Regions:
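Basic, ligand-binding patches in group-transfer machinery
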Residues: 1-39
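The AdoMet/dcAdoMet-binding core of the Class I SAM-like
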Residues: 53-156
């Protein structure tokens, strides 16, 4: 007979918001490429030694759109949703003078990005609260705002 205790958890980490799971997606077994699954959907893919590549069409489109809108290398950006933090990680390499703020409601997702997706938060500002509330309360203004928060197929 099966028991709940005998069943291994499918979550790498269970947070207050998500079942967070990591999946190795390396095609050659040599390069470390990993996906982050939140509940049932891949929310990002990152490579240890290649922060410049966006591995999903979604991330590539958001990055490309933002890069066409930046007024200069010292732009300010507000990202709603962190996931693997692939875009901020790339921007840290390209635009070290940019002021990037990320609203990620789940601190466990941010910790997972740091521990397993090679994200260094020291250059950015991270806000662990609902982005709508933060934007309503802050006096800060941003050159770019990217909405990349979703749960499975719904935007909050």
């Amino acid at each position: 007979a099966w028991s709940v205790q005998a069943m291994p958890s499918v979550c790498t980490k269970e947070s207050d918001y998500f079942c967070i799971r990591f999946v190795d997606v390396s095609s050659d077994g040599q390069t470390t490429v990993r996906g982050m699954v939140l509940d049932h959907l891949v929310h990002g893919i990152g490579a240890q030694d290649d922060p410049m590549t966006m591995y999903t069409d979604h991330a590539a489109a958001l990055d490309h759109l933002a890069m066409n809108l930046v007024p200069n290398a010292a732009f300010s950006a507000f990202l709603i949703g962190g996931g693997t933090y692939s875009i901020p990680r790339k921007w840290q390499m390209l635009f070290p003078e940019a002021q990037v703020t990320i609203a990620e409601i789940d601190p466990s997702v941010t910790q997972a990005a740091q521990d397993s997706f090679w994200y260094d938060p020291t250059q950015d500002t991270i806000v662990h609260q609902d982005a709508r509330r933060f934007l309503n309360e802050t006096q800060d203004r941003y050159d770019i705002v990217i909405v990349d928060a979703f749960t499975d197929i719904a935007v909050p």
